[in-house]
Each structure stands twice: as C-alpha cells, then as structure tokens.
Amino acid sequence: MQELYNPSEIEALVQKHWHEHKTFEVTEDESKEKFYCLSMFPYPSGRLHMGHVRNYTIGDVVARYQRLQGKNVLQPIGWDSFGLPAENAAINNKASPAPWTYENIDYMKNQLKLLGFGYDWSREIATCTPEYYRWEQWFFTQLYAKGLVYKKTSSVNWCPNDETVLANEQVQDGCCWRCDTEVIQKEIPQWFIKITDYAEELLNDIDTLDGWPEQVKAMQRNWIGRSEGIEMTFAVADSDASFDIYTTRPDTLMGVTYVAIAAGHPLAEQSAQNNPELAAFLEECKNADTTEAAMASMEKKGVATGLQAIHPISGKLVPIWVANFVLMNYGTGAVMSVPAHDQRDYEFATKYQLAIEAVIKPVDGEVDVSKEAYTEKGVVFNSGDAFPELDGLDFQAAFEAIDARLTAEGKGKRQVNYRLRDWGVSRQRYWGAPIPMVTLADGTVVPTPEDQLPVILPEDVVMDGIQSPIKADKAWAETTVNGQPATRETDTFDTFMESSWYYARYCSPHADEMLDPAKANYWLPVDQYIGGIEHACMHLLYFRFFHKLLRDAGLVNSDEPAKQLLTQGMVLADAYYYTNEKGARVWVSPLEVTVVEKDDKGRIIKAIDNQGHELVYTGMSKMSKSKNNGIDPQVMVEKYGADTVRLFMMFASPPELTLEWQESGVEGAHRFIKRFWKLASDHVAAGKTEALDTSKLNADQKALRRELHKTIAKVSDDIARRQMFNTAVASVMELMNHLLKASQETAQDRALLAEALSAVTRLLYPIVPHMTFTLWNELGNEGDIEDSRWPEVDESALVEDSKLIVVQVNGKVRAKITVAADASKEDVEALGMSDEHVQKHTEGLTVRKVIYVPGKLLSIVAN
C-alpha cells in the first residue's frame, strides 16, 4: 500500500473500475428491498456549480448507505434540457440551441463522473430528445381525451415592435430586453391542464407526506389555498345584467358600500364604450404587471363605471368601480368592498371618498374605523331593517344565517374555492416540446394522431431573437390529419411538464411506451427525493399532480411520487468588488483575492486582489455569476480530490441550512483524509493481525471498543433517520482522535485497530467512496466495498464494566474514582470517602451530607 495519499491517482482508478464493472447499474429484483434515491436533475447550463455538488453529494451519500444496507438501490441521472437559457445562448451565437445543449451535457456528465457519484448511467435521459418528449405528447393527448385539457385566452408579455411574446426574464424595467420597446399585456389562446380538478386531493394528501418538511407542506397548503365562502349574485340596477361575487367574509355583507370589478370584466368593457376616462384606465390596466409582488406594492387605483349594483339583501344601490387590484383570472373578477373591515378597501374608499359603514365590532367593546379598518372577526351590528336578526351573531352564526337566506331567495350558495389556478402549459418559445394539437381547415382543433407522434422539434435552425423558428416555418406547421390539411400548434410545452414525470421514466427509460407499469410499480414511489425548497410550489406541486394523473391512467399504483423529501440549503461564498474608473462595481472571484486581513473577531476588514485592487467585502452571499463568487468544483477537485470536496460539503453544515464555502474548511477535510490514510497505511505496513478476542480486552481496550460501537450507532442514526450528515462526520473525526492516541503495543491492540479501521472505512464510504474503496482491499477484505455490509453495533461492547465517578467536596472536584458499573450507593460512598484526596479535604470536618448521582457524581458536604 502506498504511504502517501494521492487522490487524483486513486480516484481515476476507482472510477475506471466502477465504469468497467457497471457497479451502479441495477435491474428489478423482487428478492431484495428496493430503494429509489433521486436528486432533482440539472439544467445543462455548461458547468456544475457548488449547489449542484451539494445536492448530488447528499443523494449519493444516501444511496451508498442504503446499498450497504443490502438494498437494491436505484440512483439515476438525466438532463432537464429544454428551456430559455439555451435559446438566449443560441441568439447570442446566431446558432441552434441543440448543439449548445448537447455539448453542455457532455461536459457536465464528465464533471459528475469526476465527483464519483454512483449513478446508473444506463438510464440517462435528456428531456429534449424525441425519445423522451414523445411520451409526454402522447400523455397530453390522453388527458385531452379525458377532458382534462382545454384552450382559452390568457395574458402574456408582448413586444409590439418585435411582435413576439416575452418570458418574464426578458422584460427589463417594463421594456423588451432586445429592443427596449415598452412591453404590453396581450391576450392570446393558450393550453391549460385542469389541476384544479385535483385541488382537493392535492390538499388532503399533504397530510400523508410524513417524510416531507413541514415548511414545504405549509407552502403547498397556502398555494392551493382552500377557502369556504358564499358566492352571491348582485343585479345591476336599471338592467337585466347581473354578476357573481365570492366572499369568505359574508358576515360583513351588510357593510358593502361599493363593488370593485376587474378591467377585463364584461361590465367594465361595456361601460368603457361611452366613457373615455374608463377606456384609458382599462388600457393602462392591460399593460400592468399582475405578479403577486407587483400587486401588493402598486398604487391602488380605480374609475367609476357609472353603474350601480343592487345589494342582494338590503336592496340598497352601491356604485360599481373598476379597480386595478381585481384580476379577471382570479375568482369571479368582482369583489364586494367593505371598507370598514378590509384595509385595502378602506384605503381605496378613503382615496375616492366612498362611504365606510362598520357592521362588525369586538365582542366586548365598540369599533373605531376613523383611522383604519377593523379586520378581526367579532359580532355583527348595524344590520339595518333588512336583516335585523344578524345583529349580535358571531362570524360562524352570521355565515350560516346569510347562507340560509341567500340560498332560500336563489341569490347565493355556499362554495369551496381554491386559490390554485389551472396550469397554463403553453409557451411561445422554440426550445421546448411541441404541443401535439392541430387545427383542421374547418377550424376544428384535434390532437395529433398517435401514429404521427412524436411531433419532432426541428433542431437545425438559426435563432434571430425575434420569432420562434417553428412559428416562422410554414412548411413545418403544415400537415395532414385523416387526409385533411391541418396546421400544427406552434407553441411548446412549459418545461415544468418534462420535470413533472422524469422520475417515472427512469424506471423504464428505453421502453416503447410511456412507462412499463411493472417496472414503475417496482421502483415507485421514490424513497428519497432531494432538491431546493425554492421548488415547493411549482415543480413539487406539478410533480405530485402528474403522479396522480399517471395513477388515474393506470400507469402507477401509488398516490404520491416520493416518500421522503430533503430540501438542501444554498451554498454561500465571500463576495468582493472594487469600483472602476466609470463608477461601476467590478466583482472579483474569491480565488483572485490574495491578501485578507481580519479583526480579532475574525471579520474581514481589508482585502486586495491579484491585480492590486483594494476591495470592498460585502459578506457571504449565494454563489452567483452576477457577484462572481462561484467556486468551480472542477478546480477544487483537481486541487484536493473529489473525496475532499464531498467530505467538506457534508461536514460544513446541516443539509437543510446554508453552507458557507471556506477553503480553510476544505483544507481541514483534506488533512483528515490524509490522517486516516496514514493510520491505515501504517497498520497495513505492520503486517497481519491476529483475531480479536473480546474476552481478553483490558479496561482501555474496552473503552476504545465502546467508543467505536457508540460511533457506529450514532453515524447510522445520523444518516438513516436524522439525515444530519455533518454530525455523522464529526463523530467519525472524534473517534479518529481516539484511534490515533490508542496503544499499538500488543497483538490485541492491533486486532482492535483492525476492527475499527474496517468499520470506519464503511462508515466513511458513502461520503468519501474512492479512498474507502481502495482501503477496503488494502485492509485485507475480499470483494468490492459496495458489496459489503454496513457495520453492526455490538451491543455487548456498549455495556460498561465500570464507571468513572467525579467526587466533590463542598462543590469542588477533589478526586475521580473508578467503581463497578453495578456498585451500590453505599459502596461508592465508602470508596469515595477512603480516597486520600477526599480525606485530605475533609480532615477535621464533620460530613453533613453525601449526595450520589448514579454513575456520575459523588458530592460531599462537610464543615
């Protein structure tokens, strides 16, 4: 065995062995318990970043641990390879996104292999290939046949100059990223999948996700947003028209003083025909940002329509206003406004001098709405002659009373609503899977016939940055269906479509069908899923929804796609910049910082880069291109080895918290690996050891063996149950300190070290697999470490024959005594009192009290 640890040589040899022996390729095996471990697959952006490395190291640790538990472990990998970044790169290079994407896949695949991740590469998928998206297209046509797909108009960002749709990322300060034209909102037809049909099940089944973080479950509950309320009808005065309103606070109904409708509401458009001020306001609203963040912060504005609504109970007339805070695609596009009991309504009413009438007050006091709305649930008052029975009722009683009356009069009904909207899957982009729908000559829209699937996206195109190549390619759009001329849909799927079912395709990636049900039902659900919490309300919700669609299509037999979810934290790094002669910030990579001075608390107070610029240090922030503080994993692997990078990633922080990148920590991880290697090397060099005879161990040897088996127990629990990989590593490091100090004089000393090295090699294997793979055979074990078993705890080793008792006299430690583990209180007292140090400090004193804390402390009080 070589004495010095050489990571580049070791890792190359081990990776070659894994490749040649197809170590991580698996098939279904009913005789074994399966374990499916999956990390969210990457977008092939060009290079791995440390966030990827953290995610995939966590997954690899879990997978390798489960393999040593004797399970049949599937850990696949692939590429989420459609999307806007490839289009942008192609536009910059006046090329096609396809070659850029495939080159990036090749490069990043090599990076993943250098890090030693134990993937089954035979199952590799790329979502941009027809072999993959063919089945997505097929499934979409099945959903259409079941009535779960429909088309309607929806708002998009539109550049009037380029006459093209823009993604949110392509809108910069309200203008087109390419030509700086002001962006407007435009209604265009788009395809939707009815996720709302599954809203109740998606919400209820959150309660079954015992292995998911509570934060993710809470975010999904809020996103689905179930509410119970009443939908009621308001008639329009002097008209046959009426409109519906939904409210979760029917107890405030008698306080309605105006109604607000969306700019896209039919009544708004009708009223604007003879109202230039309103028409201009509707145009302004069309171009407004309607994201939640923008809606929350924007100025609330409105224009009166001139119409009045009839209150469904009192018959009172209330004005109808168009307001920019009401959206047509949320609820009914109209809200009843009760300014006394809703702060937004209050501010609007104050601004436009509308009436404010309080109808709810605290149970035990009066209400004051002179400065702000009273928004709590209290008791009803001031209901007027139309419904005096409401006065004095609490929220629930008032809800029931109003529901009963409106239902009886045919003016309303109780209803459950969801905040969740149907999933818009159309994208007016090129680099995505074509939506498999066609329009016939008579205008009928039908699915592409199955024998014409896949609808292949042409890859030999040039991006001009203005129009999608398939929208410009009339020849591509022209087709025939059943002998009739037809035109293809030129929108492509939202890329969340591909990432919603990839986990299932891994089970049978080469099948000539969407899924092989037998294989899918062997592997699914995923046992451990790993990815960022930023995906809680989009990918992770669509992921769950798609699984239920697959179940209802008879392709899988489980209700949820993943049993356990781990959401890893971000990776942070130091960020530095200097200001150039133009006054712009120039961000400098931490790797280019050559001088760093710190104060006595370790805070950076001065930094200089390799060009001599004095830098401003802005603290730790998420690794990003914009701050140039990303650390290239490949540079670190070349410098320290993959095992060191993996060890640092696991040791530096609990997995769900942020990880602060510190090269000093990487160096520390490297030193630990080298120490362990040397300990093993010295042991091997000393020759063979005799068998361990636990009956012959002395007290020190028993204590060391106890530490070993306590460590095995703790590391097992940390990895399997707690998923606290950092404390698992810390426990092994602590054990290492004991091993380095242990005597090596006798044959039993060396036999005990052999047991410890064998166990620690396996404990470290999931985290540092290359070094431990090599050591396993060097230590005299047969076969590959992947085929070994996780070390078992010897419960007898944990039993202590003796205890070390601290003896205090008047609160000060005066002695430490060793007693039999089963010694009685009387025996311990007698032994403690006979100790020469205790006698010295009690001489001439009267012992007043003796307190014994079993197995730990003997406290003597004397004066």
Swiss-Prot record:
ATP binds at residue 625. One of its GO terms (cellular component) is cytosol. It is an enzyme of class 6 (ligase). Its EC number is 6.1.1.4. It is found in: Cytoplasm. One of its GO terms (biological process) is leucyl-tRNA aminoacylation. Belongs to the class-I aminoacyl-tRNA synthetase family. PANTHER family: LEUCINE--TRNA LIGASE, MITOCHONDRIAL, LEUCYL-TRNA SYNTHETASE. This is Leucine--tRNA ligase. It comes from Shewanella frigidimarina (strain NCIMB 400). The lineage of its organism: Bacteria, Pseudomonadati, Pseudomonadota, Gammaproteobacteria, Alteromonadales. The gene is leuS.
